[in-house]
């Protein structure tokens, strides 16, 4: 009896310690994140599941000199809280640092009056709205609708997190220079014709950073609008789809791909 009690206690302690380590890891070191839109194609695809290094940037200040932190660098693929809706996480590429002068002319980005060499940039035709989001939803009597700059909510549920993201004015030139404020950063999607980013809603505060995208640990072929559907039934359908098609729809060649 005493032996069984000891085993039970050891098991309980192991579970508690494991949970504490997991909580610490996801809070301070690494966290999972999935790609819901095509704004970073073709570097990151819808259905890519990432591990995000939350430790790399850390806190700026005196203590950072003694820890393996580093400052965000131009070209980093970062995950951050969307400034207009902080509970939503975005992933973009860091283009402008604090104090930089940013100009976008056509398809060329100028940083401090010099054109930026962007080998990772794509210009992919976004297609029609039906290709992205399926049939239109016509609100019925009694629905509560909130229309924001980059989202439409019906009864508290986001129908499309990035309506504007898929259809920015592709011919627009941003002739007015943008000066990145202190402790803020300018971020853009690699898929420039299909990205709602700092060109539209401004810079990202440093304290909104969640981390640097590190690796694709799993990639699953996913319909373009599936991750934007967040209802309970929608999530259940997603899980069933993964179980049924795990082997046939997993993008095996993207597994464990380092994000650059």
Language-model features, listed with the residues they occupy:
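Extended hydrophobic leader/signal-anchor segments used for secretion and membrane insertion
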Residues: 1-260
């Amino acid at each position: 009896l005493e032996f069984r009690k000891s085993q039970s206690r050891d098991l309980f302690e192991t579970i508690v310690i494991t949970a504490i380590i997991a909580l610490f890891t996801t809070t301070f070191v690494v966290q999972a994140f999935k790609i819901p839109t095509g704004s970073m194609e073709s570097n990151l695809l819808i259905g890519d599941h990432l591990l995000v290094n939350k430790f790399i940037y850390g806190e700026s200040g005196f203590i950072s000199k003694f820890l393996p932190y580093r400052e965000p660098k131009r070209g980093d693929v970062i995950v951050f809280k969307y400034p207009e809706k902080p509970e939503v996480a975005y992933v973009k590429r860091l283009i402008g640092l604090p104090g930089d002068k940013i100009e976008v002319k056509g398809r060329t980005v100028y940083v401090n009056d010099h054109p930026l060499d962007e080998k990772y940039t794509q210009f992919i035709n976004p297609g029609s709205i039906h290709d992205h989001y399926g049939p239109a939803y016509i609100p019925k009597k009694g629905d509560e609708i909130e229309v924001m700059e980059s989202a439409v909510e019906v009864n508290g549920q986001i129908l499309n997190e990035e309506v504007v993201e898929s259809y920015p004015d592709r011919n627009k030139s941003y002739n007015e220079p943008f000066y990145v404020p202190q402790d803020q950063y300018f971020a853009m999607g690699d898929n420039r014709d299909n990205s709602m980013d700092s060109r539209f809603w401004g810079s990202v505060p440093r304290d909104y950073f969640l981390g640097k995208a590190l690796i694709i640990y799993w990639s699953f072929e996913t319909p373009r609008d599936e991750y934007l559907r967040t209802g309970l039934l929608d999530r259940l359908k997603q899980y069933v789809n993964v179980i049924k098609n795990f082997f046939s729809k997993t993008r095996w060649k993207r597994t464990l791909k380092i994000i650059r």
